Swiss-Prot record:
Site (Plays an important role in substrate specificity): 224
Gene: glyA
GO MF, one example: glycine hydroxymethyltransferase activity
InterPro entries found in the cross-reference section: PyrdxlP-dep_Trfase, PyrdxlP-dep_Trfase_major, PyrdxlP-dep_Trfase_small, Ser_HO-MeTrfase, Ser_HO-MeTrfase-like, Ser_HO-MeTrfase_PLP_BS, SHMT-like_dom
Protein name: Serine hydroxymethyltransferase
The UniProt record lists the keyword Lipoprotein: no
EC number of this enzyme: 2.1.2.1
GO biological process, one term: tetrahydrofolate interconversion
NCBIfam families in the record: PRK00011.1 (NF000586)
Pfam families recorded: SHMT
Modified sites of kind N6-(pyridoxal phosphate)lysine: 225
Organism: Limosilactobacillus reuteri (strain DSM 20016)
Alphabetical keyword list: Amino-acid biosynthesis, Cytoplasm, One-carbon metabolism, Pyridoxal phosphate, Transferase
Length: 411
C-alpha cells in the first residue's frame, strides 16, 4: 500500500525551494516568511474537514472544533483592525474583491479603480481580468509631475464616469493614501468606497498607515504580505448590514467549502500580529525601505518613483540604466536577489517587459535585517544594475548576498 508514500521528485522540489529561499534575498513586496506555528496550522488535520457555511451554520456535521478555529480567526481580525464585520473565508485577495463586487454591484455597473500603469491591481478593473469583463471600468492615474495620487483629478474623473463603486488601494504605490479624500469623492458621486489594503494591511493594523476601516464601506486584504500569514483573503467592514450581503456573496455566491486549515493559519498569524513585537517589526519594515530609498536616491541611473517611500515598498525607474524591468529582474536572479519587474507611470513598455522594478522589505525584515543591512542590499542592487556585463562585479555582488543570507538564516 502506497498511501502516504512520498514522491521523491515532489520532495526534492520542495527541499530545493527551501534552499533557494535560504540562499536568496527576497525583495518581492508581496512575499514574506511565516512562522513555524502558521505552517503547522496549515499542515494540520483541519485539511481533512469540509465545512460549507459559517460558524454554527454549517451544512455538514462534525464542525464544532472547526467553528472554534474560524471564530478565533474572525475575533482576532476584528480586534486587530477594530472591525465590526470580518469574513475570513476568501481563498485569495482576488476572491475577496470578487465577492464584494458581487455583493454591491450588478454586471455592467461602473467601477473606478487605480490603473495598472499607475500601481493598481488586476482586480481593480483590468480588461483581461473578471473585473474588466463583468463591469464597465475606468482607471485613475498619478499626477505626472509628483507621481502621487491627484485627488482633484480623481474627483473630476468620478464626476465624468459616475461609478457605482470606487476602489482605493494599490499594489505598487509607495505613498500614504488619503482615505478621507476618496470618501469625499465617493460621496460626491453616490458611490460605494472599497479599499483594497492587501499590501499595507500590516501597516494599518499597527497604526503605521491610517486605517480605512472607519471611512470605507468595505475593506479587502490578503492575509500574507505584511500580515505575515498564509496565502488567502479577508473582507472587513464597519457595517454588519453590508456584511450579511458579503457573506452570501462569498458562500454560496463564489465559493463552496472554506479552506479551514488555511483559516487556522490566518488565526495564528492574527494572534501573532496582536503581540507588541509585531508593531516593532512593521516599524522596521518601513525603516528598511526608507534606508534603501536613501541609497537609490544617490544613484545617477536609478530613480525612485515619486522620490520616496512611506510604506514597505519602492518602485525603481531603470530607464537611465538601459535595462528593462525584465532584464533587471533576470540579472538580479543570477546574483540571488529576487524582485519583480514593474511598470513605471506612463511606461512605454509592455507589462511583460516594463521599465522598472518593485522591491519590498517585509521578507528581509522577517529574517532580521536592519537599516544598515537594507542599505547594503540597495548598494548590491545598484552595483549589479549599473554593471550588468561585468562578471567580476556581479560575483562580488553574489558574495555580498551570500554573506547576508548566512548572517540571517531563514529559520
Amino acid at each position: 500500500m502506497n498511501y502516504g508514500k512520498k514522491s521523491p521528485q515532489l520532495w526534492a522540489a520542495i527541499e530545493n525551494e527551501e534552499q533557494r529561499q535560504q540562499d536568496t534575498i527576497e525583495l518581492i513586496a508581496s512575499e514574506n516568511i511565516v512562522s513555524d506555528a502558521v505552517r503547522e496550522a496549515q499542515g494540520s488535520v483541519l485539511t481533512n474537514k469540509y465545512a460549507e457555511g459559517y460558524p454554527n451554520k454549517r451544512y455538514y456535521g462534525g464542525c464544532e472544533f472547526i467553528d472554534q478555529v474560524e471564530q478565533l480567526a474572525i475575533d482576532y481580525a476584528k480586534k486587530l483592525f477594530n472591525a465590526a464585520y470580518v469574513n475570513v473565508q476568501p481563498h485569495s485577495g482576488s476572491q475577496a474583491n470578487m465577492a464584494v463586487y458581487q455583493a454591491l454591484l450588478k454586471p455592467g455597473d461602473v467601477i473606478l479603480g487605480m490603473g495598472m500603469d499607475a500601481g493598481g491591481h488586476l482586480t481593480h478593473g483590468a480588461t483581461v481580468n473578471f473585473s474588466g469583463k463583468l463591469y464597465k471600468t475606468y482607471g485613475y492615474g498619478l499626477n505626472p509631475d509628483t507621481e502621487e495620487l491627484d485627488y482633484d483629478e480623481i474627483m473630476a474623473l468620478a464626476k465624468k464616469v459616475k461609478p457605482q463603486l470606487i476602489v482605493a488601494g494599490a499594489s505598487a504605490y509607495s505613498r500614504i493614501i488619503d482615505w478621507q479624500a476618496f470618501r469625499k469623492i465617493a460621496d460626491e458621486v453616490g458611490a460605494y468606497l472599497m479599499v483594497d489594503m492587501a499590501h499595507i494591511a500590516g501597516l494599518v493594523a499597527t497604526g503605521t498607515h491610517p486605517s480605512p476601516l472607519p471611512i470605507a464601506d468595505v475593506v479587502t486584504t490578503t492575509t500574507h504580505k505584511t500580515l505575515r500569514g498564509p496565502r488567502g483573503g479577508m473582507i472587513l467592514s464597519k457595517s454588519t448590514e453590508l456584511g450579511r450581503k458579503i457573506n452570501s456573496a462569498v458562500f454560496p455566491g463564489i465559493q463552496g467549502g472554506p479552506l479551514e486549515h488555511v483559516i487556522a493559519g490566518k488565526a495564528q498569524a492574527f494572534y501573532e500580529d496582536l503581540q507588541p513585537e509585531y508593531a516593532e517589526y512593521i516599524q522596521q519594515v518601513v525603516k528598511n525601505a526608507q534606508a534603501m530609498e536613501k541609497v537609490f536616491n544617490t544613484s545617477k541611473q536609478i530613480r525612485v518613483v515619486s522620490g520616496k517611500t512611506e510604506n514597505h515598498l519602492l518602485v525603481l525607474d531603470l530607464t537611465k540604466t538601459g535595462l528593462t524591468g525584465k532584464d533587471a529582474q533576470n540579472l538580479l536572479d543570477r546574483v540571488h536577489i529576487t524582485t519583480n519587474k514593474e511598470a513605471i507611470p506612463n511606461d512605454p513598455r509592455s507589462p511583460f517587459i516594463t521599465s522598472g522594478l518593485r522591491i519590498g522589505t517585509p521578507a528581509i525584515t522577517s529574517r532580521g535585517f536592519k537599516e544598515e543591512d537594507a542599505q547594503k542590499v540597495a548598494e548590491l542592487i545598484s552595483t549589479a544594475l549599473t554593471n550588468p556585463t561585468d562578471e567580476e562585479r556581479l560575483q562580488e555582488v553574489a558574495k555580498g548576498v551570500h554573506e547576508l543570507t548566512t548572517k540571517y538564516p531563514l529559520n
